[in-house]
Amino acid sequence: MLSPKRTKYRKYHRGRMKGKALRGSKIVYGGFALQATEPCWITSRQIEAGRRVLTRFVKRGGKLWIRIFPDKPVTMRAAGSRMGSGKGAPAYWVAVVKPGRIIYEMKGVSDKIATRALKIAGYKMPVKTKVLKPL
């Protein structure tokens, strides 16, 4: 699963997801893409689940690009711990995804296979997605 080698700080604020994605909303590498239509946090496990679906569905053909990276740690307190005594330890990593952000890109496979594979990968995401095709 994806995670940063090192970060400036161990724990981060939750933050807010306002507006649309400014960057990463256009197809750059491949021909087909999976685009988020809602704001959410996508965990490194969910990114990996989508990647597995795509690589298995296209078998040996095609190239895949993952356009998001989980760089934000999410902390969790131990179950049954009382209030107070600081923030919990980092539990997992998430990528902050705004509407319009491209999650995956594909190239080198047929229209039918790419569309079907990206649609299945979209079911693994915690957000509504749409498949973008080349013009």
From Swiss-Prot:
Give an example GO molecular function.
structural constituent of ribosome
Please tell me whether the keyword rRNA-binding is annotated for this protein: no
The signal peptide here is: none
Whether Nucleotide-binding counts among this entry's keywords is no
Which InterPro entries is this protein grouped with? Ribosomal_uL16, Ribosomal_uL16_bact-type, Ribosomal_uL16_CS, Ribosomal_uL16_dom, Ribosomal_uL16_sf
Taken from the record, one Pfam family name reads: Ribosomal_L16
The entry's localization annotation reads: Plastid, Chloroplast
Q: Which UniProt keywords apply?
A: Chloroplast, Plastid, Ribonucleoprotein, Ribosomal protein
Classification via PROSITE patterns:
RIBOSOMAL_L16_1, RIBOSOMAL_L16_2
In terms of CDD domains, this protein maps to: Ribosomal_L16_L10e (cd01433)
Annotated Gene Ontology cellular component terms = chloroplast; mitochondrial large ribosomal subunit
GO BP, one annotated term: mitochondrial translation
Family to which the UniProt record says this protein belongs: Belongs to the universal ribosomal protein uL16 family.
UniProt protein name: Large ribosomal subunit protein uL16c
Which species does the entry assign this protein to?
A: Stigeoclonium helveticum
What phylogenetic lineage does the species belong to?
Eukaryota, Viridiplantae, Chlorophyta, core chlorophytes, Chlorophyceae
